[in-house]
Every structure is written in C-alpha cells, then in structure tokens.
Curated annotation (Swiss-Prot):
Family named by the database record: Belongs to the eukaryotic ribosomal protein eL20 family.
Lineage of source species: Eukaryota, Metazoa, Chordata, Craniata, Vertebrata
Gene label: RPL18A
Gene Ontology CC: one annotated term: ribonucleoprotein complex
Record's protein name: Large ribosomal subunit protein eL20
Residues bearing PTM Phosphotyrosine: 63
Cross-link Glycyl lysine isopeptide (Lys-Gly) (interchain with G-Cter in SUMO2) residue location(s): 11, 128, 170
GO molecular function (one): structural constituent of ribosome
Gene Ontology biological process terms from the UniProt entry: translation
Keywords: Cytoplasm, Isopeptide bond, Phosphoprotein, Ribonucleoprotein, Ribosomal protein, Ubl conjugation
Function: Component of the large ribosomal subunit. The ribosome is a large ribonucleoprotein complex responsible for the synthesis of proteins in the cell.
Segments forming a coiled coil: none
Length: 176
C-alpha cells in the first residue's frame, strides 16, 4: 500500500460466497485506513486471508463505505496500537497523537513511522485506534498540551506602526 495523501477510514464488510454446505456464511467487518476504496478492499482481503480461510476468489464484499468523523472541529488525543516489520523482525508498538480526526492521526502515524523507523506503509498494520481521555495519555509529547493555561512564545514580532518614520538610523530588533 502507498500511503499517499491523507488516509481515509473505511468500514469494509465481507464474507465467503454462500455454498450448499454453508448457505449463510458469517460476515467479517474491518476498519481499514487507506487512500481510497480500491486500496481499502484490497487491504481487507489481505488481512482476512491471514485470519480466516478466505480469499477474494471465494468471497465477496458486502459493504465498503467511508467513515466520517463525528466531531472534526475538536482536537482529540488518539492512541494507536500497531505492528510493523522492520529489517530485524516484527515489532508491536503503541503511539499517541493529537489530531482533529482519526484518519488524520493514523496518517500522522504512517509519516512518523516512515521518518523515525524507515517503516514503509505496506509493512505497517494498524490494529487498534482509540480516542484517549487526557488522563489516560502517557507520552510527554502529547501531555505537554494538556494545560488549560498553555502559552506559546512569540519569538519574531514585527511592529508595523502606521505613523512611524519610514527610514530609521538603526535596524529594528524584532526578537523579544
């Protein structure tokens, strides 16, 4: 999978094709993060074939739809449980991100894993994504923003006063 652009969250439901032996086969639902619905269906078959004796030629996709965020204007904390294949083996990992949407947090995770661990998108498997309360967060990079009186420095302020002389004898100091 190529994690191009912002990933989207898809709900994919599939099953084995009905046979005389099992006329109503069980449905399997997955939450897939992919750039488009074609890749989402492909990832579904990849994961389902690992978990069950089921493949694309002997199955069907019942539903594939994009899941939209309930509150995309509120900043939330997300915990992501994943496994990835590195050059030395397979590792489990837990990561935390702050974002407006679940898909945004997962996209951030893919970018971060590529940058920090050189993990390609095809070798990352997101197992669980959960919205976390501020009290449950563990990573200091996320916890540093849990302050109601948070203040940010203004390192480079340019004062543009209207009636100030156009030319000055000395350069202005804009770093306070």
């Amino acid at each position: 999978m190529k994690a191009s652009g912002t990933l989207r969250e898809y709900k994919v439901v599939g099953r084995c094709l009905p046979t005389p032996k099992s006329p109503a086969p069980p449905l399997y639902r997955m939450r897939i993060f992919a750039p488009n619905h074609v890749v989402a269906k492909s990832r579904f078959w990849y994961f389902v074939s690992q978990l069950k004796k089921m493949k694309k030629s002997s199955g069907e996709i019942v539903y594939c739809g994009q899941v939209f965020e309930k509150s995309p204007l509120r900043v939330k904390n997300f915990g992501i449980w994943l496994r990835y294949d590195s050059r030395s083996g397979t590792h489990n990992m837990y990561r935390e991100y702050r974002d407006l949407t679940t898909a945004g947090a997962v996209t951030q995770c893919y970018r971060d894993m590529g940058a920090r661990h050189r993990a390609r998108a095809h070798s990352i498997q997101v197992m669980k994504v959960e919205e976390m309360a501020a009290a449950r967060c563990r990573r200091p990079a996320v916890k540093q923003f849990h302050d109601s009186r948070i203040r940010f420095p203004l390192p480079h302020r340019v004062l543009r006063r209207q009636h100030k002389p156009r030319f000055s004898a000395k350069r202005p100091n804009t770093f306070f």
